[in-house]
Design a protein with these regions (language model features):
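Bacterial N-terminal signal peptides that target proteins for export
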Residues: 2-17
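A non-catalytic alpha/beta surface segment that caps or lines the substrate-entry region
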Residues: 65-66, 114-115
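Short amphipathic alpha-helical/adjacent loop interface patches that line ligand
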Residues: 10, 14, 58, 107, ...
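Hydrophobic h-region of N-terminal signal peptides that target proteins for export
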Residues: 20-27
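Generic short amphipathic/hydrophobic targeting helices enriched at N-termini
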Residues: 13-14, 21, 32
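Active-site-surrounding "flap" and adjacent substrate/cofactor-binding loops of secreted or lumenal enzymes
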Residues: 100, 107-110
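An alpha-helical repeat/solenoid feature that recognizes helix-turn-helix modules
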Residues: 30-56, 70-102, 116-154, 158-356, ...
Length: 398
C-alpha cells in the first residue's frame, strides 16, 4: 500500500491519525516522572526522550490490555481502536513493522464487533465507534481486513444527515454526522472522526484498486462544517459572530457550544469558539480538500494563532485537554506549519513545546491521565492513546 501523501507529511515516522471516547475511572495518583525543563533546546536528546516516552507508553498499554483484547471497556471498540492506532503509528514501525501479541488481540476483538450492517460497535454510538475502528483497520494494512473496511465505509456514508427535502441542503445540520442514534443531531466531533476515516479509507480503496459504489456528499459536509464556524461571511446562522474573541473559531454543533455563550457590546449573544473544536474544524476542512488560502481556513487559523496555548483547552480550561493536544498535533501537522505566531508576536515551535509538555505529564508507569474527568479523560487508556498519537506525529520532525 502506498500510504496517502499526508501520512508521510504527518511526521515521516507514523502512518495515520485517529480520535475517540472511553469510560473508566482514573487509578490512584502515581509518582511523577522527573520533569524536563521547558527551556531545553530542541536537539537529538529531545528526540530520544520522545521515543523513550512512546516506548514506555506502549509498554503500559500492553500491560493494561484485557485478555479479551480490548482496552478499558468492551462496550466501546473505539477505545481499543485508538490504542491500536498508537501501536501502528509508533516510530519503530518506520524501521521494521511489528505486530506484537497485544495488537493481534486488539484487532481480533475489533473484528468481533463488526455488525451485519457494516458498523463496528456493540450497542451504542455506532458512528463514533465505527469511524475510529475503520481508521485503525486502514492503518493495519492487512488484506483480510478489506471486506470490513468497505462495509464500514458504506455504513458511515449512510449516516450522513439530510433533513427536510431529500437531496437538498436546506438545514444547518445537513451534511453532518452524529453519534449514529436517531435522537442525536450531528456534531463537529463525530463529523471530523467520520471525515477522517472516510478520507483515509478512500485512499486505501484507491491504492488497492477496490471497487465500491457511492461516496459521501462532501459538499454537504462542507456546508455542515461552515455552519459550525463563527464566520458570518459563510455562515448565515444568527449566532455566528465576527467579534474578535470568536471570529473564525468553531463550536460543537450549529447553535451549540460546549464553551457557552457571551454577551457582545452590541447586545447580541455569541456562542463561544473553543480550542479543540477549532482544531477539529481545521482538520475537517483539510479532509474536505479546502486550500490554505480559502477564507474559511484562513479565519480558523487566525483564531488558533490568537488563542494558542498548551496550558489549557482554550475556552474549556482543563476539560478535554488531551483531546485538544491530540487534535492540535494532527491539525497543525496536516496544515503544514513549523511554527505558530501567537497574538503576542511569539513564534512557537509547537512540536518541541508540545513534546516537552507531554513528557512532563507522563506518569511513572508510562501512562497519561487528566485530573479533570470530563469526556472521560481520567481514563488512562484513552488519554495515553491521545498522548502517544500526538508524540508519534511529532517525532519525525524534531
Amino acid at each position: 500500500m502506498n500510504l496517502p501523501r499526508f501520512f508521510e507529511d504527518l511526521s515521516r515516522a507514523c502512518s495515520g491519525v485517529v480520535l475517540l471516547l472511553s469510560t473508566a475511572v482514573l487509578s490512584a495518583a502515581e509518582p511523577s516522572l522527573p520533569k524536563v525543563s521547558l527551556h531545553t533546546e530542541p536537539n537529538a536528546s529531545l528526540r530520544n526522550e520522545v521515543r523513550q516516552a512512546i516506548a514506555k507508553g506502549l509498554g503500559w498499554l500492553e500491560k493494561s490490555q484485557n485478555t479479551n483484547g480490548f482496552w478499558s471497556t468492551a462496550d466501546y471498540p473505539a477505545i481499543t481502536a485508538l490504542g491500536l492506532a498508537a501501536f501502528e503509528m509508533q516510530p519503530a514501525n518506520r524501521e521494521h513493522k511489528t505486530t506484537p501479541p497485544a495488537v493481534q488481540r486488539g484487532y481480533a476483538y475489533l473484528l468481533s464487533c463488526v455488525q451485519s450492517n457494516g458498523g463496528i460497535y456493540r450497542k451504542e454510538l455506532p458512528s463514533y465507534n465505527t469511524s475510529v475502528s475503520l481508521t485503525a483497520l486502514v492503518l493495519a494494512n492487512r488484506p483480510e481486513y478489506q471486506p470490513a473496511i468497505l462495509k464500514a465505509r458504506k455504513f458511515i456514508m449512510g449516516l450522513q444527515t439530510d433533513l427536510n427535502e431529500p437531496g437538498r441542503i436546506d438545514s444547518p445540520f445537513d451534511g453532518g454526522i452524529g453519534y449514529g442514534m436517531q435522537d442525536k443531531n450531528p456534531d463537529l466531533s463525530n463529523t471530523s472522526l467520520a471525515l477522517e476515516a472516510l478520507y483515509l479509507s478512500k485512499q486505501y480503496v484507491k491504492d488497492h484498486h477496490l471497487e465500491e459504489a457511492g461516496d459521501l456528499n462532501w459538499q454537504a459536509a462542507i456546508h455542515f462544517l461552515q455552519c459550525c464556524q463563527n464566520l458570518p461571511a459563510s455562515n448565515a446562522e444568527p449566532w455566528a459572530s465576527n467579534d474578535p474573541q470568536n471570529k473564525g473559531g468553531f463550536i460543537y454543533a450549529p447553535g451549540r457550544s460546549m464553551a457557552g455563550e457571551t454577551n457582545l457590546p452590541s447586545g447580541r449573544v455569541a456562542l463561544r469558539s473553543y480550542g479543540s473544536m477549532s482544531y477539529a474544524g481545521l482538520l475537517s476542512y483539510i479532509y474536505a480538500d479546502l486550500k490554505r488560502d480559502d477564507p474559511r481556513v484562513v479565519a480558523v487559523m487566525d483564531w488558533l494563532r490568537g488563542n494558542f496555548t498548551l496550558e489549557e483547552n482554550p475556552g474549556m480550561g482543563p476539560q478535554g485537554l488531551f483531546y485538544y493536544y491530540h487534535t492540535l498535533a494532527k491539525a497543525l501537522t496536516l496544515y503544514g506549519t513549523e511554527t505558530v505566531e501567537t497574538s503576542a508576536g511569539r513564534n512557537v515551535k509547537w512540536r518541541e513545546d508540545l513534546a516537552l509538555k507531554l513528557i512532563n505529564l507522563q506518569r511513572a508507569d508510562g501512562s497519561w491521565a487528566n485530573e479533570n474527568g470530563r469526556w472521560f479523560e481520567k481514563d488512562p487508556a484513552l488519554v495515553t492513546a491521545y498522548a502517544l498519537i500526538a508524540l508519534d506525529m511529532i517525532y519525525g520532525k524534531i
